[in-house]
Amino acid sequence: MTELSANHGGSAKGTENPFEYDYETVRKGGLIFAGLAFVVGLLILLSKRFRCGGSKKHRQVNEDEL
């Protein structure tokens, strides 16, 4: 407790802070994830738009079913 109050909560010189992040790696990982999510989203949208199968079959609905 005296060590924390002596340096006001900061890390002492010579010791490595366990909460220090490598922001370059985090940034690259986030950009890769965002790019993959974008591509997967486009593939899903385009696969629903350009379906193979020709004409669409519409189901007839009776008034009783409404």
Swiss-Prot record:
GO MF: ATPase activator activity; protein-macromolecule adaptor activity; sodium channel regulator activity
GO biological process, one term: intracellular potassium ion homeostasis
TM ranges: 29-46
Domain of life: Eukaryota
Family (UniProt): Belongs to the FXYD family.
Purpose of the protein: May be involved in forming the receptor site for cardiac glycoside binding or may modulate the transport function of the sodium ATPase.
Full protein name: Sodium/potassium-transporting ATPase subunit gamma
